[in-house]
Amino acid sequence: MNKKIEKFLNDNKIKYEVILHKKVFTAIDKAATLKIKQKLSGKTLVLRADKDFVVALIPANKNLNKDALKKTINFLRKKLGNTAIKKIDFASETQIKKVFKGAKTGAVVPFGVVWRKVLFVDKSFLKEKAIFINSGDYFQSLKISPKIFQKLPDCFLGSFSKAR
């Protein structure tokens, strides 16, 4: 696991379990490998919101509803007195490598604050006791309580996933 992530978890007293597994690149593969339901496997998405980057976490069995996420972002920006974003799209691998230094594409950890980025978490995770998220490595995942997202700085909950 990335030392920066490990330090963040420990400094914030976040309880986690490292789960070792075969090499996986997607949240769906992670669910199959760990023999868990796809709704328990977190899919980390890096998006470009106009000129800013944000991180979103949704269940593996869902797709991102960009319009709903855009509304969530704009609601937050309005509360903070900022202008609304006009466009939201997935970041390219090149952008991810440049902005999220040390992160591996396909294994980005959903703790945006580590890179000074805002994290948006689909609130459907709050129904679960534990979820499995990226650790920053293709060979391991983190088992955590989704309740921690309610306490993290620069983390916002919303409904922005849709059925595949």
What are these regions (language model features)?
Residues 1-164:
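Extended, low-hydrophobicity, polar/charged segments
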